[in-house]
Amino acid sequence: MPRRAGSGQLPLPRGWEEARDYDGKVFYIDHNTRRTSWIDPRDRLTKPLSFADCVGDELPWGWEAGFDPQIGAYYIDHINKTTQIEDPRKQWRGEQEKMLKDYLSVAQDALRTQKELYHVKEQRLALALDEYVRLNDAYKEKSSSHTSLFSGSSSSTKYDPDILKAEISTTQLRVKKLKRELSHMKQELLYKQQGFETLQQIDEKMSGGQSGYELNEAKAILTELKSIRKAISSGEKEKQDLMQSLAKLQERFHLDQNMGSSEPDLRSSPVNSHLSLSRQTLDAGSQTSISGDIGVRSRSNLAEKVRLSLQYEEAKRSMANLKIELSKLDGEAWPGALDIEKEKLMLINEKEELLKELQFITPQKRSQEELERLEAERQHLEEELMAARGSPSRALTERLKLEEKRKELLQKLEETTKLTTSLYSQLQSLSSSTLSMSSGSSLGSLASSRGSLNTSSRGSLNSLSSSELYYSSQGDQMDTDYQYKLDFLLQEKGGYIPSGPITTIHENEVVKSPSQPGQSGLCGVGVTASSHTTPLTEASKSVASLSSRSSLSSLSPPGSPLVLDSVFPGSSHDTSPHQFPTDFEDCELSRRFADVGLGENQALLDSDSGGASQPLLEDKGLSDCPGELLCEGATDVEKSLPKRRGLHLRGDKTTRVSAAASDESVAGDSGVYEASMKQPGEMEDVPYSEEDVTIVETAQVQIGLRYDTKSSSFMVIIAQLRNLHAFSIPHSSKVYFRVALLPSSADVSCLFRTKVHPPTESVLYNDVFRVAVSQAALQQKTLRVDLCSASKHRREECLAGTQISLADLPFSNEIFMLWYNLLPSKQMPCKKNEDGNEEPGARSQQPMLDPIDLDAVSALLARTSAELLAVEQELAQEEEEEELRPERRGPGRDCLTMLREASDEPAALRESGVPLAEGSRCTEDPKPCPRGPETSQCRKEPAEDPGQLPSGLPTLVDKETNTDEVVDSNMAVRPKDRSSLSSRQHPFVRNSVIVRSQTFSPGERSQYICRLNRSDSDSSTLAKKSLFVRNSTERRSLRVKRAVCQPTLRRTAQECPVRTSLDLELDLQASLTRQSRLNDELQALRGLRQKLEELKAQGETDLPPGVLEDERFQKLLKQAEKQAEQTKEEQKQDLNAERLMRQVSKDVCRLREQSQKEPRQVQSFREKIAYFTRAKISIPSLPADDV
């Protein structure tokens, strides 16, 4: 019956009646038409008729919101009698479709790039196979003739037996490697093509506003998703079983190899029974929740619990700080977009490799048509590379560096989560009354069920949309060789700039250059790259002191030994500063000395330059190299070269000294010229004469050597060549270096070639080659570096070379950049006459030491000293002017951050001469400031142009006497608030830091005002807020404040992300894709197990060579062995750590959303889309047949 109007309600129209369904839902009966309706007929008069008329969260007439326990919120259109899971008031679905279409264009470009990369590798493989056959034929011919072209009568060493053997083995390894890479890329291309086609189908299916899923369809999809998840779970269990069987097979191979006998059944062997018994014992121990020896040894030890509790709290703080740092990093526009840029860089590099291989093909026994075809292909490649070099990429370089930093932080975060999980399990095993793991005491609660891999029993969309499927793709790493190449491209010239020469690394044998702070880049700089890095969250351990007792009080600038009056008395006063430029132009150092500039810490003549020498700035062509490379890798002064230094002056008239204090160092080793400051007790060292023209005419090459003990890899850097005019080379020819590690090995790439360059006075190469060799084998080898020229007829002619004995190579993970003389090929001695501690370059130097002119050197040093004194006086005047008009400096940032940000303008920094104090690991000039009182001028040298002075230069203070953060002197900050300022810069750090006495702190302090306030009764400093006012809003209790904040937090926690039909379709297709790829992995594992079982049945005791040579197979077998040896407790800890890592990743996304950098739902949707085209193959296919 019609309701009576009352309480402001409109009455129902005539003939209408309100009724209730069996479940209590209200519906309306129209007796006039004898029909029922869910729509209140009065809503036509009270509700908006369209979405355009809606205000706030209103729904128009005919729409109703419902809730399903399995789906969640859904919406009913009573007019059209349809349901949908998208909110019709939101525009999110349209934004999703737009993002999907945008990503399809990006993915299509990436697919095209990788297909082209695959095609280039195919060309390289075909060329390498042909070259391998021809080299084998040439070797057979030369072996039968018993003649060697490596003699003093011939300069052509194309078919020298040693070089030919190395080239054959290198080509053979190149063929094997290209086959493995092509097999891997083929599978990866297939996955990406399938993912791209899947996204296209989703776009066609879900485009348009009326293509969403209804309620019943969504429930059917959920049911299908559950079944797929069960299949994936069973597949993962089968994968674990296959991995364990692989571990057992590998163990059997190792046992047979060590014992020399084959065991038919591993389970019957006593060794295996012992292993099984030990594992059972560990499993029994894990059932009692005792983790390791700590729980058994100190179950009731209170001190142990306190120690673990402190470590646990410290790990949580570290994890929170890492989350903050990750959230502050700017994310890329699309997940995987940076991978596309990397592949474009690698495509350029592969084309360079192909071009180089086309230039060095064997012309013998080739038809004229084939030679013309190869020449046309070579010219086409050159044109493509010239076009690629014209695009700027500084922004790309910054993005790549940012990505490297993100990877470092993610790795640290993963290690911290594992440590946190381990400490928590140990605390649990000690006592049941240990720390609580509730969300209130831990930012990443292990007890939280969010982000779990297990699906909720209700099967809600929240569980289905978790990062289970998409999380696994984030931790996949790039191929090792690709990563090595990319890191070197980043480090070359401070970032990859295609407008300059593009670096080529032969045969993918490049080494990963250090990218962490405190390590050196590979731009040919003469630095020592230490393997020890400083964590990103830690500041520099030592900065310049501002106290009066500081070493900065000296007048001598750093790196300028010529100012020492005790060594050169009166020399600085004999020469007028105005006469210096004229006299300076006459000397051989010429303008190169002036080009370096006095603002770069006077780095030309330093007695202790081994820690970070400066050969890059010696050449005019290298002075344009961006400065960020130079600031990234400078190491401490203490980490100097153990035997010799690599700093060399432009003029080639430097002294040869020994850098070590003991008699172990070899003076003049390998023809190395070194610039160093002369101490009073070292005057017996003989400098070179200014008139010795033979030194200037000697061609020299700068070579860097390093052995990485972690990866057992030997790295050779061909940095630069100078004084090429010593050889008469036609302009039509091109020069390059050929590097050979002799005697050659069949299983190691031993021959490499740099890219070719036209003959100029100085040539910059910056090529890096990597050889996987053990220390013992490396000490038995000799490095041979030949300077070769190639004419249009592809005739390889060896002009000069040098040989370096590796018997005394220090294995310290540091790069040693040294200059070597290039002896003409007719004068180069045979390697049989080498001495272990003396190299041919060193012996060739001995006759050059006879003509000595000490007066010329003294005059040069005197003029330089006078110039430095004049510059000091000018700088002192400029400093006085700067003190009268001080510039505002930014709040305290550490030295590392400031110089990294300022590296984008290397020219300005070169002129400003901003130094670092003793022990600092980063400076624009790679040579650190030496210790001692002569370093005061390091911070007193302003820029030559004050207008170019970078803003925000930090105030350097002594960390040993001051524990406060450096703040702006003009910034009104109370001393009591310094801790809070520090907490804003480093969040989640306790504010209760014990600050030592400020009595001996350097620098001026702001006025200390003492005032006692009731609102701040525990302090005696100036109040930041207004004085105490009773009953004011700010004085409300914490209980009231918590009550106000709790509803907001609760709503945020309960707020579910908006789900659309597109999200549901992506989840379904991602599950199907994951299941398909898992089946491929299982098939590959079954094939590998079958192959190993067949080899075992045939009596083989060693693993196949293809498995041993492939790093991916080695990684797979190590992972299988690790999983087989894990106990149940360790497996549980790994699962907890993975769950915690997933929760931490959600926290990072939430923090990014709070900082308004990127909405969380946008991040999640982009990850879903990128999952389909980011195929990472963890199980490689079976290796190809060997050559």
Swiss-Prot record:
Residues 438-464, 830-849, 874-963 are annotated as: Disordered. The modification Phosphothreonine is found at T999. GO terms for biological process: hippo signaling; negative regulation of cell population proliferation; negative regulation of hippo signaling; negative regulation of organ growth; negative regulation of transcription by RNA polymerase II. It holds the Pfam family WW. It comes from Mus musculus. It comes from the Eukaryota. InterPro entries: C2_dom (IPR000008), C2_domain_sf (IPR035892), C2_WWC (IPR037771), WW_dom (IPR001202), WW_dom_sf (IPR036020), WWC/KIBRA_Hippo_Reg (IPR051105). Residues 121-194, 224-256, 302-423, 859-885, 1063-1143 form a coiled coil. Residues 10-43, 57-90 form the WW domain. One of its GO terms (molecular function) is kinase binding. Forms homodimers and heterodimers with WWC1 and WWC3. Interacts with DLC1 and PRKCZ. Interacts (via WW domains) with LATS1 and LATS2. Residues 697-820 form the C2 domain. Signal peptide: none annotated. The keyword Ribosomal protein does not apply. It is found in: Cytoplasm, Cytosol. This is Protein WWC2. One of its GO terms (cellular component) is cytosol. Residues 875-884 have a biased composition (Acidic residues). Residues 1026-1045 are annotated as: Interaction with PRKCZ. Keywords: Coiled coil, Cytoplasm, Phosphoprotein, Repeat, Repressor, Transcription, Transcription regulation. The modification Phosphoserine is found at S286, S1017. Regulator of the Hippo signaling pathway, also known as the Salvador-Warts-Hippo (SWH) pathway. Enhances phosphorylation of LATS1 and YAP1 and negatively regulates cell proliferation and organ growth due to a suppression of the transcriptional activity of YAP1, the major effector of the Hippo pathway. Belongs to the WWC family.
